[in-house]
Amino acid sequence: MSIDTLLYTSLAVGAVYLASVALYELYWSPLAHIPGPKLAACTRLYEFFYDVVCGGQYTFKIADLHKQYGPIIRISPREIHIHDPNYYETLYATNSPRNKDPWFTAHFGVDESAFSTLDYRLHRSRRAMIAPFFAKARMDGAQPLIKANLAKLIRHLDAHASSQSVLKVEVAYNSFTGDVITGYTSYRSFEYLETTDMVPIWSETVRNLVESGMLSRHLPGFFPLLAWAGSRCIAAVYPKLLPVIAFRMKCAQEVNFMWTNSEEGKKEAIQSGCSEPALFPELVSRASSAPDITEERLLHEFITIVAAGTETTAHTMTVCTFHIAHNQSILDKLREELDNRFHSNADMDLQTLEQLPYLTGIIYEGLRLSYGLSHRLQRISPIDPLKYKDIAIPPNTPVGMSSALMHHDESIFPQSHEFIPERWTDPNDRRRLNKYMVSFSKGSRQCIGMNLAFAELYLGIATLFRRYDMKLHDTTLDDVQLHGDKMLPRAKNGSKGVRVTLRRAQSVG
């Protein structure tokens, strides 16, 4: 057989194969009855184009597709997306089994964490080990740690106020939340607030970690190849990966220290003044009687919890900061509420702050416009078929919904792109709207650190805006609005972030 004949035969076989795949997906697949673009039904390249080539634009394309095809659409050969706010609690159910999609979780390199656990039964047991450490009842005990880190943050902000230098708030807030989550779960914080510059690279590390996972699911051999080629190749081809590698190494060192120095951990607990055991030292102490607790498992949990507990809360604080600094009326109402309740910042306590309606409105509106994960979160019903209206969805089909679409549904949140704390201040309105506010997701896989995040937000926003007047510096709404979805929300290309100058407020601080 000649080379030409072999080539033509190969092309013909390839064409027949691709045509067969397309025909199957369009006409015989169990999902063929779901409306949506034909190309998306045939190949993941449709998603690849919008998410990788266009830079995190598939969420916006999905929103357009819903306008064209309706509330349920097929967005890939094996995935469904639904946009119907009233269906959210059905999909993200508390008492129905829900698996995760490996397409979403498998490329972060933390397979043994509760976050990445696919099977609902194994997830239940893994989550049960962790959840008590983040219970609402434990948040009173977290206040001293949060306030201590706020005091460190304030020293940095006072220096900026004195020098009138420009502060990039994402850097400050990520250092604050990073030190809180590491101190809370392991007694040993990363101490970013102890440095002179608050480690600017840290504010991008978690974003790079998540973004690289999103890219690697489309190009599964790309990052292993880079790792094999070495750091010089990584620096030349994808430098965003370097701080991610450094972060994983730092996490591995911390977990190894806890794993091999359990007695030292007890001493640090006493020195830190903690009245209750921290998550990771406590899990280490149980390892001898729990064979499923391994150093590798703890590393995966540590990476996940630190990453999740840093960027999302810091981003919510950043969104709140922009809108408070941008709107004097919001700042005045917040200050009045705080001044009427507290004589000084030292008097503030979490339980009282949670009762303040306007502060609560600011925090909920900040959560709504920061989205948590802006990307869709797929759930799989492993046993029973799901049903959306009269459309049956076969078992083991990934089905996703998106906070970025939920939070901008005008039928639920009129003027959804506006920052309006008043929409949350009435308790009845808050109860009604909270059903549709999904920054922490809902159901059996809801964000485990939600209570700690709320504690940081209440204490952080109240303390900082009672103490400082912040003036935006070369910052616009485009620097906080959602322009790209790379798992985490991204501002416009070229954004320098939210930057402010500060001065001490005239009121009590």
From Swiss-Prot:
EC annotation from Swiss-Prot or TrEMBL: 1.14.14.-
GO molecular function, one term: monooxygenase activity
Localization of this protein: Membrane
Keyword Cell division listed: no
CDD domains noted in UniProt: CYP58-like
Keyword terms of this UniProt record: Glycoprotein, Heme, Iron, Membrane, Metal-binding, Monooxygenase, Oxidoreductase, Transmembrane, Transmembrane helix
Gene3D superfamilies: Cytochrome P450 (1.10.630.10)
Membrane topology: Single-pass membrane protein
Glycan attachment points: 327, 493
Pathway: Mycotoxin biosynthesis
Positions contributing to heme binding: 447
Transmembrane segments: 7-29
Induction field: Expression is positively regulated by the ochratoxin cluster transcription factor otaR1, probably via its binding to the conserved 5'-ACGT-3' bZIP binding motifs found in multiple copies (3 to 4) in the promoters of the OTA biosynthetic genes. Expression is induced by sucrose, glucose and arabinose which repress the gal4 transcription factor, a negative regulator of the ochratoxin gene cluster.
Catalytic activity: 7-methylmellein + 3 reduced [NADPH--hemoprotein reductase] + 3 O2 = 7-carboxymellein + 3 oxidized [NADPH--hemoprotein reductase] + 4 H2O + 4 H(+)
PANTHER family from the UniProt entry: CYTOCHROME P450 (PTHR24305), N-ACETYLTRYPTOPHAN 6-HYDROXYLASE IVOC-RELATED (PTHR24305:SF157)
Functional summary from the UniProt entry: Cytochrome P450 monooxygenase; part of the gene cluster that mediates the biosynthesis of ochratoxin A (OTA), a mycotoxin composed of a chlorinated type I polyketide dihydroisocoumarin moiety linked to L-phenylalanine, and demonstrated to have nephrotoxic, immunotoxic, genotoxic, neurotoxic, and teratogenic properties. OtaC catalyzes the oxidation of 7-methylmellein (7-MM) into 7-carboxymellein.
Similarity-based family: Belongs to the cytochrome P450 family.
Protein name listed in UniProt: Cytochrome P450 monooxygenase otaC
Lineage of producing organism: Eukaryota, Fungi, Dikarya, Ascomycota, Pezizomycotina
